[in-house]
From Swiss-Prot:
Gene Ontology molecular function terms on file: ATP binding; ATP hydrolysis activity
UniProt-listed Pfam families: ABC_tran (PF00005)
Keyword tRNA processing: no
UniProt-recorded name of the protein: Putative carbohydrate transport ATP-binding protein MG119
Keywords from the named record: ATP-binding, Cell membrane, Membrane, Nucleotide-binding, Repeat, Sugar transport, Transport
Xref: PANTHER family: CARBOHYDRATE TRANSPORT ATP-BINDING PROTEIN MG119-RELATED, GUANOSINE IMPORT ATP-BINDING PROTEIN NUPO
UniProt record similarity statement: Belongs to the ABC transporter superfamily.
UniProt-listed Gene3D superfamilies: P-loop containing nucleotide triphosphate hydrolases
Stated role: Part of the ABC transporter complex involved in carbohydrates import. Probably responsible for energy coupling to the transport system.
Residues engaged in binding ATP: G40, E41, N42, G43, A44, G45, K46, S47
Amino acid sequence: MEKVAFKMEHISKSFDNGKIKANVDVSLVVYENTVHTILGENGAGKSTLTSILFGLYKPDSGKIFIGEKQVNFKSSKDAVKHKIGMVHQHFKLIENYTVLDNIILGNESRFGFLPLINRKVSEAKIKTIMEKYGIFVDLKQKVSNLTVGQQQRVEILKVLFRDSNILIFDEPTAVLSDLEIQNFLKIIANFKKLGKTIVLISHKLNEIKQVADTATVLRLGKVVGSFDVKTTPVDKIALLMMGKELKQTKNTTDFVAKDEPVLKVQNLNLFLNKSLAYKFLVRCNNIHKAQQIKKNKPLKDLWIISFLNKLTTSNKTPKLVKGLINKLGLSYQENTDETISFAIHKGEIFAIAGVEGNGQSQLVNLICGIEKAASNKLIFNNIDISRWSIRKRINAGISFVLEDRHKYGLILDQTVRFNTVNNQINNRPFSSWNFLKPMEIALYSNTIIKKFDVRGSAEGSAVVRRLSGGNQQKLIIGREMTKQNDLLVLAQVTRGLDIGAIAFIHENILLAKANNKAILLVSYELDEILALADTVAVINKGRIVGMGKRDLMDRQSIGRLIMQ
């Protein structure tokens, strides 16, 4: 007979004095040594429910049992004592600390009664855990130098270090590349073999089918179904999640360029740019040269490229320095002289395909103005904007939806209403003579909230930090797509969204195309690119290795180019 790992009975939770009902009379049972997934749309109450299980929130009503024993968690410390661990969607790591210090933080081994940390004991335990579960990370590295996938492994090691038996993962694959996703799914399968109980929040039904045993579906905070994953068809799961059948969204028009390009990218080098050179020189303690770059002193761009090329290709360069160059996103020994060029026209969806880490982030950052390239030209509506600030580019008519929504898209401790206008608040009709117009802002904000179904917003008064990750993303997308701009730059625009929200965003991208907007779509989801793009460019190691119309760029040809 299966043993109960935990059960939750009649759990209810609301926020903002009952305005937002996150969970309504939710009950579920999870058995030991199984993978149980919690499914639902963005804002369905999945993260709230697991946060209650982890002690981050207290339920308004209901009971929690670990095994057969009822518990009352006052904080996450109580949950940890009961062998529950949680890996959050947004990692809780200190970037300036090493991997080792992040793992042991709050649970350090001491030298007897002395206030000194015994790192050797902790390090030995972590290495044993890494060997047992096949999860390896360099313990001496700073977290700031790790990839997203490696940071996730640090979070997993943190919960294993605390001897957790019930492991909760909130949207674990939302920020991972395809290869990292496959590695993560192997880790989950291994956890199950070794006796762990897994709770998985995800929107990706193909991943759920691979690893989950059972599932519970939430809709508007209520349970609408529980079932065996292996025997339930994907279509039925999607129907339970959405409450309706979804139509497939696909670009069926044949694009023909009729006008001058809205955006021309000329001779852009994705790996050698001033920003990264500056960081590199600071790390190498060459402060004088670094300051020259930062202050735009008369220092030839060619010098930077020459310096870096000589340094990175030299056999005398220490491995430590070459490793540092890699961490900064620089390429060495190949493709340092490669540049890319392309153009995007009105009414065109120009998609960038490729495996993560091949220059996509650098490309978007250079177009947005976050980074300045060593030598390039960016022509927007026949004007060279290469040296323009981010603000000037926005005011000129470029909209951005970037990968890191917390860093570049939102002010988390401000309201939803403020965030709908935060990069245009000084413009009409939202202000006049330096005075804000609250009625105009509220009207505009409510239009975006309703059109893009931003749930949990309390008519714009809710703090953005309170929203689910998917609803935060919908807020940014709604804000940027509502602007009357000529160019949309969309990077990983549907990452973290449920299947219904993805279909809705795809419809709006095609609507923007129909309204003659030029769209740059950067995505690691090949299905998304094939469904939406007019033109597909495949990027590999910082250069375009293939480009063509959608009809000529099928899955096989794109796959071959990606793997070159």
